[in-house]
Amino acid sequence: MKRIFTTLLALVAFVAMVTAQTVVESKRPSNKAFQKAVATIMYKTNGHDITAKRMKAMEVTQSELNHFPHTEWRAYRNIKDTDALAEAELSSVPYFMRQALDKIKKEVETTKVKDGTVAIWLLYNMGYIIKTPTSVFGIDIHTRYVEEVADLVDFTMVTHAHGDHTNKPFLKAMSARGKQVFAAFDIEGVNSTKIEHEAVYTVGDITIRTTIGDHNKKLRNFVTSYEIDCGPRTDNTVLFHTGDSNNYLQLNPEKKVDIFMLHMSVGLNIQAAINNIQPRHVFLSHLQELGHRIDKWRWTFHDALKLKDKLNHNHIWIPCWGERIIYKRSNWK
């Protein structure tokens, strides 16, 4: 009886400890702590070297993200009044998003991209903005800041027709400015370049090779992968953005890939894809998609860190919103 009682006490203590840990992990940070973490992520650390400082900032930021449901995200996206919008962006996730965009806008304008390099920013989800010595372009831009981003980029690409990868108001704004939009599907009100499977396009000195693959078993030939040669002034740096592609056998770039931008949890055998493609760097993407429920399809920094530890590759990145990455191939072995 004494042994049973002791066991019960131990069990109660364990449950209490787990409960306490859960409460601590879900505790919402103060606005000051959150803003400090955002600054640390965007200005003081990088997604390749997960230092203790970076880890702490990711933990604080994640705690706030965990308190921002998809319903609040939708409400924020629908704010029309400028005063109400400014008020919303003083704190929480809208603050992070506004700070990220302001940083990107300033840095895209002021960053002098040297020959042999490419500047890359993660805007949101799988939406990247890339600046070369000759051009600025976007991939899978999904934002409430339609006009501001449309002014920022020269052309853009869309991997597929899902709402977390495309944004019709943004694409219409691009089209209205006479800027090129690449997509494999028709978009009402957008004068787009209708891309094909196994095709090659050029924009200035940038070469884009497209292939089309599966999203899942039901959505066959649904996602466009973009193999982007950023041009001779970048030493022909190659980006390979595969959107929500989930079949690694369909991911077959022709050139040596510098940066492989992939969905971290779409059913893709990532290690097999890495083994097949042999990229120099891997960007784990599709984290913190706020349109998804917190408990469904919203992958966290913790999820990405666990995946990073499992993968056999020396250069796995976990980029965050607003982070600038200056890539120069010769700086890496």
Where are the regions that the model predicts?
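Active-site environment of divalent metal-dependent phosphoester hydrolases
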Residues: 145-147, 162-166, 188-190, 201, ...
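Divalent metal-coordination and catalytic microenvironments
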Residues: 130, 160, 208, 244, ...
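Short internal beta-strands
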Residues: 157-161, 178-187, 283-288
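Binuclear metal-ion centers of metallo-dependent hydrolases, dominated by the metallo-beta-lactamase
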Residues: 21-29, 194-204, 220, 232, ...
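Bacterial Sec-dependent N-terminal signal peptides
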Residues: 1-21
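Metallo-beta-lactamase
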Residues: 20-122, 129-148, 153-155, 166, ...
